[in-house]
């Protein structure tokens, strides 16, 4: 299964629609996961022309009342035998600060910390993949057997208004991988 991963689109603040380069970047994806800061349902409508969408949004009730694609705060998805925890702002108990592309996630946890247990506190389930956003910094890292993916932002990478990134995950029952795609490769 091929999964498009996106976060922090901030539409319409940075444009009426997400960047058009997302279309070729997500070519052939079976589903799209959005890790929040969506702002408007029209963004998900636009993405849903590519593939079905699952999303989280802080305060989802404001603009997404009754929208089955979006839940507030966090959710757990089962895809291809993997349990995926989806959250916008990943602050795990014991975590020193938010993860950025410049520091391995291991540096954010105390020595001997059990990431799996900490994540179970957040998601109320054991997960083997975590998708998060908020930082606008792309991260793909496996830590303590858990694949951690932050796709960055397609429209505000590192809080700078320019073309940014998304991620694509490849899932099989016994395999998981993800890579960051720089959208400038598609224009």
List the predicted regions and their residue ranges:
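Mobile, glycine- and charge-enriched loop segments
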Residues: 1-4, 73-107
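Short, charged, surface-exposed secondary-structure boundary motifs
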Residues: 63-69, 87, 158-166
């Amino acid at each position: 299964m091929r999964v498009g991963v996106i976060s922090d689109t901030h539409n319409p603040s940075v444009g009426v629609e997400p960047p058009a380069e997302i279309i070729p970047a997500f070519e052939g994806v079976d589903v799209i996961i959005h890790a929040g800061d969506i702002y408007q349902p029209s963004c998900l409508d636009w993405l849903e022309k590519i593939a079905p969408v699952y999303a989280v949004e802080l305060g989802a009730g404001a603009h997404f009342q009754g929208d089955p694609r979006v839940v507030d705060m966090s959710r757990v998805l089962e895809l291809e035998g993997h349990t995926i925890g989806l959250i916008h702002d990943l602050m795990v108990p014991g975590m020193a600060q938010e993860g950025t592309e410049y520091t391995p996630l291991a540096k954010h946890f105390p020595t001997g910390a059990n990431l799996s247990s900490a994540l179970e506190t957040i998601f109320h389930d054991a997960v083997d993949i975590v998708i998060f956003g908020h930082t606008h910094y792309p991260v793909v890292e496996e830590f303590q057997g858990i694949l951690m993916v932050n796709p960055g932002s397609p429209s505000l990478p590192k809080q700078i208004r320019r073309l940014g990134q998304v991620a694509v995950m490849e899932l099989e029952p016994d395999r998981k991988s993800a890579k960051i795609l720089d959208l400038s490769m598609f224009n």
